[in-house]
Amino acid sequence: MGKKDKKNNTLAQNRKAYHDYFIEETFEAGIALVGTEVKSIRGGKANLKDSYASIRNGEVFVCNMHVSPYEQGNIFNRDPLRERKLLLHKSQINTLLGYTAQQGYTLIPLSLYLKNGRVKVALGVAKGKKNYDKRDAIAAKAAKRDIDRQMKERMRY
């Protein structure tokens, strides 16, 4: 038996986070879920848009993460927007607490993915972008796309 192919196990992404924030550092965290939520997330029914994480009483919770109810879940389904606990080591929580104590920093979930059969969250320490930063990023992306297009044309001949 060979090893399984390394494939993309990303279940949900927060694309808006990279547009609205500068991501300073990322952390990997486990997430406490019930069975029907895991099935729903594996089915691609999770939405990280407008979600954030907060630290309370030495624990980290992700808020506003929408997980649609599992279709065959019946009474076992939970509230789609409930707060879910993130599983981190105490030293990691203290590091995050140090970051968020600074003015302008927040915790944003960047993606949900599978690792060894477990759902993990990529948690980013983020600082908000101003409107001119967003415009600069869009202009740089457009310039790069034009350069790549021209290079492709030149390489054909």
Curated annotation (Swiss-Prot):
Q: What is this protein called?
A: SsrA-binding protein
Database matches in Pfam families: SmpB
PROSITE patterns, from UniProt? SSRP
Its localization reads: Cytoplasm
Write out the GO cellular component annotations: cytosol
Give the family, as the similarity comment puts it.
Answer: Belongs to the SmpB family.
What the protein does? Required for rescue of stalled ribosomes mediated by trans-translation. Binds to transfer-messenger RNA (tmRNA), required for stable association of tmRNA with ribosomes. tmRNA and SmpB together mimic tRNA shape, replacing the anticodon stem-loop with SmpB. tmRNA is encoded by the ssrA gene; the 2 termini fold to resemble tRNA(Ala) and it encodes a 'tag peptide', a short internal open reading frame. During trans-translation Ala-aminoacylated tmRNA acts like a tRNA, entering the A-site of stalled ribosomes, displacing the stalled mRNA.
Q: Name one GO molecular function term.
A: RNA binding
**Cross-referenced PANTHER family:** SSRA-BINDING PROTEIN, TMRNA-BINDING COMPONENT OF TRANS-TRANSLATION TAGGING COMPLEX
Could you tell me the superkingdom of the organism this chain comes from? Answer: Bacteria
What keywords would UniProt list here?
Cytoplasm, RNA-binding
What is any one GO biological process for this UniProt entry? Answer: trans-translation
